[in-house]
Structures are given as structure tokens and as C-alpha cells.
């Protein structure tokens, strides 16, 4: 196959995947700008993407582009070095700066990939992956001692940029990205034949401006995010509390509905019993059986529900201090159910006191 067997074909694949990745990086920097200018809209975008099928398809497609780009880059690098030493592209009259980036594209690519891994661990793994795996609330990442839900992207920005090393690593990654994109941007056009004396200078100029604007925005955003994280801006912003509250209300509703559904399923076999047709002994036996089933359910599922609600209440109180939890009907019902279950669990765990008979 031409795209695999020929050097030109492999360079063409590199060019096509490179174009797609440049467009993605441009989209990413614009989305980051939304987090600064309209943080509520940024959270809405994060929730929209989430673990929905279209987001998963896009993520897999993007991952495939990166893998193809990296594999072909390594392939071409080793092929070119075997044939022409360290020269990787036959290009006319390069500037010294471009010459350096051309000779070090592999090293720059490795730095960019390392930075990408850090970025994925800080964001994708804690957000979309958590949603995809349906991890329990108890294992959610913590910010200021409170759990953070996967869809609340602004809180993950604050969590990441609270770390003193984050802006340093990001800026190093952005500088490497500038060199890598600046050379890769125009060289991909050179690959498809746009390398004459008229177009090559224009493409180099476009590449430098485009890359410089994108990377400058990334660096500015990293600085702004760091300053905001140090001030706990996103976790304390009054305009975001309604959004955080809505997310916790949904969690409370889901937990309550799940508990209620399981409770109804457990008690379903006993709903249509006609105790009037039973003997006293049979009634006592059934009553004891129902009591045992209820106690087992409360001990197992009730404990799980209480633990979920403890996490929800902790997150809600930390992120929505100005909002009354009882303003949401399902949240209020869930909190009441939790309080009742806690009382029952405490009573069930308390051993009976030995009662001395009266003399």
C-alpha cells in the first residue's frame, strides 16, 4: 500500500495527521479561553462532552491520530537517519532556528508526548475516564478536602494549577510545542508539494504567526489559571455555585432513586400477602422474615446509601456554601432518608444492655 510502503506516502500520513492535530490544539486553546471568560459555559461544555458516545468516538479518533502520528514519526526518523544521518527533510534554505527544530523534531516530539501524558492524567483520567468507568463517589478526586465531580472542569483546573510544578511543566511543554508545530506546520505543506520559492516563505510566516499566537495564549492561560487557583477562585466563585449545586442535586437524586428502587424490589414479594388468611404462627413467621430482610437491606444497601450521601453532602457544603440544600426536593428527601438510616444503623449496632431482674 502506497501510504505504508513508500517514504512519500508515510510523509503524507504525517502531514494529514499533523493538520488534524494542529486544528485540535487550536480548538483546545479556544476552549481554555472559555474557562477564563465564561467558566460556567466551560463546565457546560465539559458536561456535554462527558462520557457520551460522540465524545468517546472523538476521543478514540483523536487518540488514533496521535498514535499514527507518533508511529510514523518514529518510522520516518529511523528511516531517514539510516539513509541520511540526522537529516529528516530535504528542504531548501532553512533559517537557523528552523534548522535546529528540524534536526530535533524527535526530541521535541518526545517532550510534547511527555507533557501530553501529564495533561491526560490531570484532566482526562480524572474526568472522562471516571465517568466512563462509573467510579463510586468515594473515589472521586479531592479539592480542599472535598470531592469533585467529573463534569466540573473549572474545579479540576484549580486542582491542577494549585500544584507548584504544574505551570512550570506546562510552559516547558508549550515551548516544545511551539518548535514542533512551527516546523511541522509548514513542512506538512512542503510534503504535498507546496515548496516553491513563492509559497514556502509564506507558509513559514503563517506557521510562525499561527503557532506563536496559539502557544502565547496557552502560556497566558497557564499563568491566569495558576493565579486563580492560588486564590481558590473557581471553588469560591458565587456565580458558579448554582452549577455546582445542580450537579450535586443530580447525584443525590440518583442515589435516592437507586436506593428506593432496590428497597421496593426487596419488599416486592411481601406486598400482596394476605395476612388475614394466615394463622397467628404463620403471621409471626412472615413478620420475622420481613424484619430480617429489612435489617439485612439496611445493613448492606442502607450503609452504601449513607456513605454516598456523606460524600454528596461534603461536596455540596464545600462548593455551595450560599445555597440551602433543602431548596431541592430530592436532596431534602435524600438527606432525611440518610438521617433515618443512620439512626437505624446506630440502633442496630448498639448491643442490648443486660437487664437485671427486680428482686
What does each of the following model-derived ranges do?
Residues 1-359:
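Membrane-embedded alpha-helical bundles that constitute the cytochrome b-like, heme-associated redox core
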Amino acid at each position: 500500500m502506497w501510504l505504508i510502503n513508500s517514504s512519500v506516502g508515510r510523509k503524507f500520513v504525517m502531514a494529514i495527521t499533523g493538520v488534524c492535530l494542529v486544528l485540535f490544539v487550536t480548538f483546545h486553546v479556544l476552549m481554555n479561553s472559555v474557562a477564563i471568560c465564561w467558566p460556567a459555559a466551560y463546565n457546560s461544555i465539559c458536561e456535554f462532552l462527558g462520557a457520551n458516545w460522540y465524545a468517546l468516538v472523538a476521543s478514540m479518533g483523536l487518540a488514533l491520530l496521535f498514535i499514527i502520528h507518533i508511529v510514523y514519526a518514529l518510522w520516518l526518523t529511523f528511516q531517514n537517519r539510516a539513509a541520511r544521518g540526522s537529516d529528516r527533510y530535504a528542504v531548501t534554505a532553512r533559517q537557523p532556528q528552523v534548522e535546529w527544530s528540524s534536526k530535533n523534531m524527535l526530541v521535541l516530539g518526545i517532550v510534547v508526548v511527555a507533557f501530553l501524558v501529564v495533561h491526560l492524567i490531570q484532566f482526562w483520567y480524572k474526568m472522562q475516564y471516571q465517568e466512563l468507568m462509573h467510579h463510586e463517589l468515594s473515589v472521586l478526586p479531592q479539592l480542599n478536602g472535598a470531592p469533585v465531580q467529573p463534569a466540573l472542569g473549572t474545579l479540576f483546573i484549580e486542582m491542577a494549577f494549585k500544584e507548584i510544578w504544574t505551570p512550570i511543566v506546562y510552559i516547558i511543554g508549550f515551548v516544545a510545542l511551539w518548535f514542533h508545530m512551527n516546523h511541522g506546520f509548514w513542512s506538512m505543506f512542503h510534503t504535498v508539494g507546496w515548496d516553491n520559492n513563492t509559497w514556502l516563505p509564506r507558509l513559514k510566516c503563517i506557521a510562525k504567526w499561527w503557532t506563536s499566537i496559539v502557544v502565547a495564549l496557552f502560556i497566558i492561560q497557564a499563568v491566569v489559571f495558576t493565579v486563580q487557583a492560588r486564590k481558590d477562585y473557581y471553588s469560591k466563585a458565587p456565580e458558579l455555585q448554582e452549577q455546582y449545586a445542580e450537579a450535586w442535586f443530580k447525584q443525590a437524586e440518583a442515589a435516592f432513586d437507586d436506593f428506593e428502587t432496590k428497597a421496593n424490589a426487596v419488599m416486592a414479594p411481601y406486598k400482596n400477602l394476605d395476612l388475614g388468611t394466615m394463622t397467628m404462627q404463620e403471621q409471626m413467621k412472615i413478620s420475622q422474615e420481613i424484619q430480617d430482610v429489612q435489617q439485612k437491606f439496611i445493613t448492606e444497601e442502607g450503609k452504601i446509601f449513607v456513605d454516598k450521601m456523606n460524600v454528596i453532602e461534603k461536596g455540596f457544603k464545600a462548593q455551595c456554601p450560599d445555597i440551602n440544600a433543602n431548596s431541592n426536593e430530592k436532596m431534602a428527601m435524600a438527606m432525611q432518608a440518610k438521617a433515618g438510616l443512620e439512626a437505624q444503623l446506630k440502633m442496630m449496632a448498639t448491643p442490648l444492655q443486660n437487664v437485671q431482674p427486680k428482686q
